[in-house]
């Protein structure tokens, strides 16, 4: 071993060894238990950031730990390579998205290798390559044949100046990010996949995901949003049509005082035909795109249509209003409004002077007051005719039954979940494999004509998609007839919804090789951010069920266990510029002064200017507080960066980046290196003889095996990697202080250092690879995780706490197998106990075996 720990030399050498020996390349082995560990694959943005490093370090620790358990471990990597940022970067750098993407992949691949992640690089792919998306295109045509794909008009953000569709993130304060033109809402035909056909199964199967965080499952349950209610019809006076509404509160039906409809509802269009003011209001609503989440807080606006709805049970006439809080995309685009029992309806009714009729009162008989706010609790019906006195459930059933008997409604189950719109009016995505013939018929592209290849040699003007601008690209034939290609591309969530499955057989001449897929799937451990809870994780679950129903996989779910890593935070600093805006300064350019408690009291940048400390916030480009992993690896080595990432915080909590912590991790590795070097320089250690150990040696060996037991549980079951590292550090402190005068002292140290090297290997594999060889072993990559010796954990002695009347009066060391009588006798003889019971009568003695003796006396 070199005298000094030199991470750069070691890491380069060990990484060469892994590459040359294809250490992490795996294949199916029916004789070995498999373990598939996957971290969410990166978008090739150009450089890795610390969030990536944290995610991939956790994945590598889990993978290497499972390898040491003797399992056949698959840990693949690839690139989520389509998407809008590549288009933006291409315009900015005057290039095309493809070369920009491929350059980034090469650079980031090198960065991943420098961090020592044990990937099977033979399985690497980029989703922007035709050999990947070709199978996605074919699967889409199969879903179309099954009736699970359809086309309908849907609203998009439209820039009238550029004549182009904008993604939500390209709309800034209601205007186009490029030309500042007010954005409009435009209805265009788009492709959808029927995820709603699987809504109930997606909901039910969450109960089987024991290895998922409860929070993610709750988020998905809410997103799917199953509710039981009643679908009912309001006739429209003077019109030969009905308004269909869905309600989860049919018990409030007798309190309806108006009906709200969406601006996009056909009835709204009809009412506005001869009403310019109404038409203008509809345009205003349509051009204010509202996310469902914003409805609760936005100002409620409406306008009367002049139309009247007829109550289905009591025949009361109620006005029909267009309301900006009713969305066409949700439910039927119409709602029955009960201002007395719904706060949103109450605010609207108060604003427009509409009736507020209470029909539910508290079940406990307390006074009902709807003068200031709606009463939204469930209670007992009144002013509801034949339904008076019924509670919620009884009223629900009775009103539903009456509506059904009269052909005006029925009980139904509703889902908040909407079908998945997969059309994007962008260039850098997989072309949707559909064509339209001259007779207007839409057809899937036949399998023998796939893939529909996205041309990569294009010029980006920053406005129109090159495949929309190039009229020749769309021209094709179908069965010998002229046809036009679909020029929309797939939502990039399509690629990320099945990539985990493609890794099982990346060269397969089909979307999957079922035999290989069923060996590896489901993924045993998936790692990624909680921000993907409702989109990517739900779409992947859906896609897996589609693959199952197409006969490719046997499992119902793609991911057994899910770990959502916390964000990486760093100090952020700024100064205020002449225009009053914030200019963010990189923490690497800031000198800080701290008080006695470590709080920042003063900060100046490289020019000497005072800067404000904004606190510890998520690392991001916009706040200029990202720390480049490359710089840290160059300065301290990959093992140090990995160790800090795993030690600084529990994996699922936020991690505060502190370079002092990185320095601490580096010092610890140097201490381990030094102890191993000093130990190995003395030559081979004598054999361990457990029967020849004295009490101190037994205690130290017990600590070694307690640590093995704790670290094993922390890593395998609890996934509290930080406490596992803390336990190893504690053991290191004890070993450093332990005497090394006898042969058995060295034997215990040898056993301990081998265990520490194996336990640190998943976290800091390069240094452990070297130390393992120095300790006289062969290849740590194929070694086994240490097991603790039950016999070593057995204690010869126990420490008993002595109490008199519940107060601590002393401690007593007894043989581990001492009886209660022996402990009582020794306890009574204790000098301090004698002092406190002198002159008193012992009433009883309470003994907690092996822990405590309490003498009750008065």
Curated annotation (Swiss-Prot):
Its main location: cytoplasm. A motif ('KMSKS' region) lies at residues 618-622. It comes from the Bacteria. Keywords: Aminoacyl-tRNA synthetase, ATP-binding, Cytoplasm, Ligase, Nucleotide-binding, Protein biosynthesis. GO terms for cellular component: cytosol. Gene3D superfamilies: 2.20.28.290, 3.10.20.590, HUPs, Isoleucyl-tRNA Synthetase, Domain 1. It is an enzyme of class 6 (ligase). GO terms for molecular function: aminoacyl-tRNA deacylase activity; ATP binding; leucine-tRNA ligase activity. GO terms for biological process: leucyl-tRNA aminoacylation. It is found in: Cytoplasm. Its EC number is 6.1.1.4. It catalyses: tRNA(Leu) + L-leucine + ATP = L-leucyl-tRNA(Leu) + AMP + diphosphate. ATP binds at residue 621. A motif ('HIGH' region) lies at residues 42-52. PANTHER family: LEUCINE--TRNA LIGASE, MITOCHONDRIAL, LEUCYL-TRNA SYNTHETASE. Belongs to the class-I aminoacyl-tRNA synthetase family. This is Leucine--tRNA ligase.
């Amino acid at each position: 071993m070199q005298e000094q720990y030199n991470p750069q030399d070691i890491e380069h050498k060990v990484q060469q060894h892994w590459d040359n020996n294809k250490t992490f390349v795996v294949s199916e082995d029916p004789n070995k238990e498999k373990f598939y560990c996957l971290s969410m694959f990166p978008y090739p943005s150009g450089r890795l950031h610390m969030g990536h490093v944290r995610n991939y370090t956790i994945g590598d620790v889990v993978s290497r730990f499972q390898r040491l358990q003797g399992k056949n471990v698959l840990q693949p990597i690839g690139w989520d390579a389509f998407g809008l940022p590549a288009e933006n970067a291409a315009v900015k750098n005057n290039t095309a998205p493809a070369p920009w993407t491929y350059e980034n992949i090469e650079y980031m691949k090198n960065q991943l290798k420098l961090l020592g992640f044990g990937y099977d690089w033979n399985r690497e792919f980029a989703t922007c390559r035709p050999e990947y998306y070709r199978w996605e295109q074919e699967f889409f045509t199969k879903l179309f044949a099954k009736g699970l794909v359809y086309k309908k008009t849907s609203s998009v953000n439209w820039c009238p100046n550029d004549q182009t569709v904008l993604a939500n993130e390209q709309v800034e304060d209601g205007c186009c990010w490029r030309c500042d033109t007010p954005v409009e809402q435009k209805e265009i035909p788009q492709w959808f996949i029927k995820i709603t056909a699987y809504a109930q199964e997606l909901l039910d199967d969450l109960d089987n995901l024991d290895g998922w965080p409860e929070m993610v499952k709750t988020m998905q349950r809410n997103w799917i949003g199953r509710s039981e209610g009643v679908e009912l019809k309001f006739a429209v006076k003077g019109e030969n049509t009905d308004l269909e509404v869905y309600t989860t509160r049919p018990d409030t039906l007798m309190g309806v005082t108006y009906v709200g409809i969406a601006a996009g509802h056909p009835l709204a269009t009809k009412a506005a035909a001869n009403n310019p003011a109404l038409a203008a209001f509809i345009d205003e609503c349509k051009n204010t795109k509202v996310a469902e989440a914003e409805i609760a807080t936005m100002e409620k606006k409406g306008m009367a249509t002049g139309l009247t709805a007829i109550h289905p049970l009591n025949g009361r006439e109620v006005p029909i209003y267009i309301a900006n809080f009713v969305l066409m995309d949700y439910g039927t685009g119409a709602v029955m409004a009960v201002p007395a029992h719904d706060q949103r309806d109450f605010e609207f009714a108060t604003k427009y002077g509409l009736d507020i009729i209470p029909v539910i009162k508290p079940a406990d008989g307390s006074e009902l007051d709807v003068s200031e706010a709606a009463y939204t609790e469930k209670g007992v019906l009144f002013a509801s005719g034949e339904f008076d006195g019924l509670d919620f459930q009884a009223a629900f059933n009775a009103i539903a039954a009456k509506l059904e008997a009269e052909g005006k409604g029925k009980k139904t189950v509703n889902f908040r979940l909407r079908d998945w719109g997969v059309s994007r009016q962008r260039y850098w995505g997989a072309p949707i494999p559909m064509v339209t013939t001259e007779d207007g018929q839409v057809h899937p592209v036949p399998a023998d004509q796939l893939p529909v290849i996205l041309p990569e040699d294009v010029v980006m003007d920053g406005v129109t998609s090159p495949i929309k601008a190039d009229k020749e690209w769309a021209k094709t034939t179908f069965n010998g007839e002229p046809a036009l290609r679909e020029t929309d591309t797939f939502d990039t969530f399509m690629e990320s919804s099945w990539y985990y499955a493609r890794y099982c057989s990346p060269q397969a001449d089909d979307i999957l090789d079922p035999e290989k897929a069923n060996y590896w799937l489901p993924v045993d451990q998936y790692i990624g951010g909680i921000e993907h809870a409702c989109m990517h994780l739900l779409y992947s679950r859906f896609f897996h069920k589609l693959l199952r129903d197409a006969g490719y996989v046997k499992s119902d779910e793609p991911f057994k266990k899910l770990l959502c890593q916390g964000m990486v935070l760093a100090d952020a600093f700024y100064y205020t510029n002449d225009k009053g805006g914030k200019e963010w300064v990189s923490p690497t350019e800031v000198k800080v002064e701290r008080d006695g408690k470590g709080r920042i009291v003063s900060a100046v940048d490289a020019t000497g200017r005072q800067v404000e400390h904004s606190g510890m916030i998520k690392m991001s480009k916009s706040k200029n507080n990202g720390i480049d992993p490359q710089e840290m690896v160059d300065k301290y080595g990959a093992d140090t960066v990995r160790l800090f990432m795993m030690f600084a915080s529990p994996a699922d909590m936020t991690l505060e980046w502190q370079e002092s912590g990185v320095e601490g991790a580096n010092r610890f590795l140097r201490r381990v290196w030094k102890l191993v070097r000093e130990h190995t320089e003395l030559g081979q250690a004598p054999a361990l003889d457990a029967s020849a150990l004295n009490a101190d040696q037994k205690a130290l060996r017990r600590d070694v095996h307690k640590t093995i037991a704790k670290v094993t549980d922390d890593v395998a079951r609890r996934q509290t990697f930080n406490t596992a590292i803390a336990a190893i550090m504690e053991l290191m402190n004890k070993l450093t202080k332990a005497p090394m005068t006898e042969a058995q002292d060295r034997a215990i140290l040898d056993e301990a250092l081998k265990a520490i090297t194996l336990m640190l290997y998943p976290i800091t594999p390069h240094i452990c690879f070297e130390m393992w060889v120095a300790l006289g072993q062969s290849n740590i990559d194929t070694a086994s995780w240490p097991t603790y010796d039950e016999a070593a954990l057995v204690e010869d002695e126990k420490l008993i706490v002595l109490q008199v009347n519940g107060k601590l009066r002393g401690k007593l060391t007894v043989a581990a197998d001492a009886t209660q009588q022996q402990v009582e006798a020794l306890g009574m003889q204790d000098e301090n106990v004698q002092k406190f019971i002198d002159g008193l009568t012992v009433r009883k003695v309470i003994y907690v075996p092996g822990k405590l003796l309490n003498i009750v006396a008065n």
